[in-house]
């Protein structure tokens, strides 16, 4: 990097921060935080615990957004002033230090962009994730289990907690179906970018001839809904089946039919839960899963109608990403257009940067 490249980078980053400031309005956030502080000091604030919880979540979200904005604004100002000073004094050592720190400065601005992008109504919620292998038998089942592990590792890296809701093991390898709840700040905001079809190209370990295979798995992500959000489900529109739950490898088969499957006829959505020994609890969780899926479906319809020229790129039916392991190694996201060669790292859950690239690319459209 040289002086010209760094000065151009500063211009680009200043434009970004300026645009973000015009959207988030830092002064308005400060005003709102003062209002919340006054509310919290009111003796009657905790009389309505539910409302107090909602305001508490809002405070956390906008405090983090303001903090990220101030960090980015100050870091950019400091770098700009130091650059002007070092340039005027021809201080080569300081200039080189600024050039070396340029990626860190870009990361600070990206952090601000992401906190702005994750300020949507549902972004802060927990996420319900389901993975379904496509046609292709054992190979597709194995691909679904690789994706499942990738998300578990991602959650581990981010400090998210995972609760398995349903797990159906494949006959030879992998899995037939899995649903799990991801708990943590902005879990849905990040994982919503994973909605869609994931394609794998590799030499199959299950093919004795060592041929190249292409497999598909669909990933469906919906926000865990608060109890106060009403989703109407008519009794005539669903079928509820009860069956015996089983653990991995057919272990721990329940003697009672505690597992629950709900089929929603109008949409074809099927949800299953065998997480608990209690049929009643599994049924309640399955209904929660169904409501979340129906809510997500409605959100997608609204996005599609709002964008008449092109359907939403976050959708269950879109092929969103290709993972090529043979004849070369590359993961390419169809929405951001970014390609990554660190395939092993990605399959080990290092997907945050890739997801953030998608969120930024979709916002830019």
Swiss-Prot record:
Keyword list, A-Z: Cytoplasm, Methylation, Protein biosynthesis
Stretches of the chain forming a coiled coil according to its record: none
Modification after translation (UniProt): Methylated by PrmC. Methylation increases the termination efficiency of RF2.
Location(s) in or outside the cell: Cytoplasm
UniProt keyword Protein biosynthesis present: yes
Molecular function GO labels: translation release factor activity, codon specific
Cellular component terms per the entry's GO annotation: cytoplasm
Residue positions where N5-methylglutamine is found in the record: 251
SMART domains, per database record: PCRF (SM00937)
Chief location of this protein within or outside the cell: cytoplasm
Pfam family, one: PCRF
HAMAP family linked: Rel_fac_2
PANTHER family: CLASS I PEPTIDE CHAIN RELEASE FACTOR, PEPTIDE CHAIN RELEASE FACTOR 2
Similarity comment text for this entry: Belongs to the prokaryotic/mitochondrial release factor family.
Protein role: Peptide chain release factor 2 directs the termination of translation in response to the peptide chain termination codons UGA and UAA.
Protein's recorded name: Peptide chain release factor 2
Species of the source: Campylobacter jejuni subsp. doylei (strain ATCC BAA-1458 / RM4099 / 269.97)
High-level lineage: Bacteria, Pseudomonadati, Campylobacterota, Epsilonproteobacteria, Campylobacterales
Gene: prfB
């Amino acid at each position: 990097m040289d002086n010209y490249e760094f000065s151009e980078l500063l211009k680009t980053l200043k434009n970004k921060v300026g645009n973000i400031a015009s959207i988030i309005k830092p002064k308005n956030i400060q005003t709102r935080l003062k209002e919340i502080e006054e509310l919290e000091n009111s003796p009657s604030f905790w009389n309505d615990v539910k409302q107090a919880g909602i305001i508490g979540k809002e405070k956390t979200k906008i405090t983090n957004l303001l903090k990220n904005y101030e960090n980015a604004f100050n870091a950019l100002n400091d770098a700009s002033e130091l650059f002007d000073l070092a340039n005027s004094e021809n201080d080569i050592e300081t200039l080189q230090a600024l050039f070396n720190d340029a990626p860190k400065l870009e990361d600070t601005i990206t952090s601000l962009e992401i906190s702005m992008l994750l300020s949507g109504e549902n972004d802060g919620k927990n996420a319900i994730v389901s993975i379904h292998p496509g046609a292709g038998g054992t190979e597709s089942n194995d691909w679904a289990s690789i994706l499942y592990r990738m998300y578990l590792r991602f959650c581990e890296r981010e400090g998210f907690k995972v609760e398995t809701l349903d797990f159906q093991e494949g006959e030879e390898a992998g899995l037939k179906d899995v649903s799990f709840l991801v708990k943590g700040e902005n879990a849905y905001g990040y994982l919503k970018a994973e909605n869609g079809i994931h394609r794998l190209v590799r030499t199959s370990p299950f093919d004795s001839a060592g041929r190249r295979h292409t497999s598909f798995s669909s990933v469906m992500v919906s926000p865990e809904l608060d109890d106060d959000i009403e989703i109407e489900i008519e009794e005539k529109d669903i079928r509820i089946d009860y069956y015996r739950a089983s653990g991995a490898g057919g272990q721990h088969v329940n003697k009672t039919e505690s597992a629950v499957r709900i089929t929603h006829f109008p949409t074809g959505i099927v949800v299953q839960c065998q997480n608990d020994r209690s049929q009643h609890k599994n049924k309640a969780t399955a209904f929660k899963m169904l409501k979340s899926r129906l809510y997500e479906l409605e959100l997608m319809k609204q996005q599609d109608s709002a964008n008449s020229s092109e359907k939403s790129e976050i959708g269950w039916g879109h092929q969103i990403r290709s993972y090529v392991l043979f004849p070369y190694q590359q993961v390419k996201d169809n929405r951001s257009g970014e390609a990554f060669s660190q395939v092993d790292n990605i399959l080990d859950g290092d997907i945050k940067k890739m997801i953030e690239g998608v969120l930024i690319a979709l916002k830019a459209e």
